[in-house]
Amino acid sequence: MVYETSYESGRKPFKPDLHRGKWEKPTDYIYACFGLALKLDSFVVSYWFFFDMGLFGILPYYIYMALYLVPILVIHSFMGQFSSSGFISAFRVSPFFKGMGYVSLALSLATLLYYSLFAFVPLIFIMHSLRPTLPWSCEGISSWSNESTICNMTNTQVHTLLDSRNKWETFEMTIVRAPSVIFFKKYYEVTSQPVDESYILSWHIVGFSFAIWALITFIFYNFSETAKFGKLVRYMVVSTLVLLVVCFIRFLFLPGAWDGLTHFVKPRADSMVNGTRAMLIIVLQAFGSGWGTVIALSSFNNFKTNVMKYNWIIAFGQTLVYILFGMVTYMLDNYFKTIEPKDFSSYVLKNWVSYLSGASALSTLEWPNMWTIIYFTMMLMASLIVMITQLFTVFTSLFDEFEVLRMYKKKVIYGVLGLLSVFSVLLCSNHGVRHLTALSADSLISHSVMHLLLLLAVLWVYGRERFQRDIEFMLGQPFASWKVFILRFIAPLFLLNSLLISIIVSSFEHLLFSMAIYISLFVLLPVLCIPGYGVYIMCKNTGGFCNRFRRACRPNDWYPVEMEDRQKYEEVVGNADITHQLYEVTEEVN
């Protein structure tokens, strides 16, 4: 394969952003990737479809981690670190596939809309925890609600209710709600009765949503520089994990907590079976909601950073986060099981146990206001870490790809945040929540397809030998051929399996809606944009079809940004593979 510069291909030359900066500490890359494990919608999806897995359900994760998570992390980090550019410009390695970068941009922005839900829900509980009496506690709910909850449903009352409701029925079941679920539900209620009230906005939620985006804007106003941002994320991740451990220790004293932990660590064959499916989904969460997040984060590494070692640390660290969150969720879930009566058919409805129902369990602790604030502050920080990290990679990729935007960085950042805050209002209705949260499941399909295309672009189109040579040059150490074999032949098999599981999960999300419309909007259209952009690149080339296709697939301005590394790379590659001296492309920089 022949290398080309932009001048020879007729395209605008790539000019690196010399002011993009580097991490203050090399480990900031690790902390930022740890933050991706706090993507809490993955816990919601896996718990809903594959609940009751326990610790042994996570064991298949280690197999997947070795066979395709870490290898694909290496591909992502190689593209970002070698090119020192975001997830759009990094596809100079094969411009035909550059549409993947734009699809990643669209996925990042779209998923940020629904992910704000995971931020403003904790904020609601934090603000109301400042009251002297928690409104969802057994004492507080009696002042504003007469509904039957776990607080006022005695055995006698339940038997009476069963007799009155099931007089002519043979099946007897009573559904009892947690007070915190009823409390949150009232924020979506409206006083009028329109034809379809699910489309009516909850103005309480709108206010909290704008508060979240205002907080994010404040963060980027003060921490938009790479070194400052990395330091902020480092402290936020450490603080979040410390609060998570504190909550874990305190929850050990909840009724039924030890039973829940025992059930969590108990070996069960069905856990392994469920884990083989669920972990295929969880593994994909390591790359963030927008797929290209790791590419952009690794672009701030020094050129010789040993990402092989870092990626193993990231994979094991993310697993630890999953286990901690899993144990906390099990303890909260088992608390409600202990208060369910044993002598009749009744069930405590645990909506979104980590968020909504969990607040009722916290209200039973000593100093409930303090523990509620601590727990939901941890959840809020986890959501903010995911959101600001993803936004940071979006802005970085935009500025790397579009040179004209670099002059207006602040305006672009505030403009994008303003638009996202406006469109996130769609989440402030029942209709919006039901439809936009389906993006989480739909994005799993897109991620699996794009991982497969990435392997095709780097290991088959760019070539196995060239990839192996480049990563050895970057790391300064050998990269074994068996690792390349796993990437080319083993990892795609697991990705195809994860694609199948993702399609099944997505179909469940769309059972009540028009599946054809949503699949076309969030899955098919983004995937079709990738070859569409490739055709666009071919049209800009000259010659016959085959010649146009070959030139569209050739690496274009693919070299290290730093002059010293670039000249060494030219010597390694040799003039036989390069049609133009690499350093001439950015001669004006020096």
Q: Could you tell me what each predicted segment is?
A:
Residues 2-25, 30, 226-390, 396-425, ...:
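Membrane-embedded translocation segments of transport machinery
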Residues 72, 115-133, 241-263, 331-333, ...:
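Hydrophobic alpha-helical segments and their helix-loop junctions in multi-pass secondary transporters
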Residues 402-417, 442-503, 508-520:
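C-terminal membrane-solvent junction of multi-pass transporters and transport-like membrane proteins
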Residues 5-13, 45-59, 74-102, 122-142, ...:
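Flexible loop linkers connecting adjacent transmembrane helices
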Residues 116-197, 257-260, 265-269, 339-363, ...:
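Extracellular/lumenal N-termini and interhelical loops of multi-pass eukaryotic membrane proteins
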Residues 31-34, 38, 60-95, 111, ...:
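Juxtamembrane transmembrane-helix boundary signature
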